[in-house]
């Protein structure tokens, strides 16, 4: 999609993307619409909700529908900045120092439970989210374009967590909740699961952003 696209064409493409994602994600249309708007605006989204509400599935579905490379990182207390950004290591065979990219070098990064990692690692994302680059050992490395972060956290669990600082929260264009499905939506989800059997749901690419 480009800025020059006709509004009607852009709207139709957006609806097609949401419809395709809706084949595997039941309900949550309003939340999906907000996430898509954030993606088109090249922003980042923070989803604050309980586990098991489909956050990972939503992120994977958006990546597939939009033709984006997807990477998931589970944020844990022992996660280091180098585990996220990458590091410079010495290659014995070539006799040179080489930079090995971390999982942040992707199009759509799912930061799962971002509030479970210490502030030092949280801060490692600041430059990446704001400037789409990372600086390591005095060298700046550009990230792939587009670069989008979809982060999640559990807002009701505080033990073993580190609240996101204001500087980090400021990098997100939106904060939203997914909330539970309605009774009718839960019934639809169960029927789809029974009809599908053990076959995993798939999302087809609709457009290349």
What is each of the regions a protein language model found here?
Residues 65-93:
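AAA+/P-loop NTPase substrate/partner-engagement loops
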Residues 45, 109, 147:
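Conserved beta-strand position immediately N-terminal to the Walker
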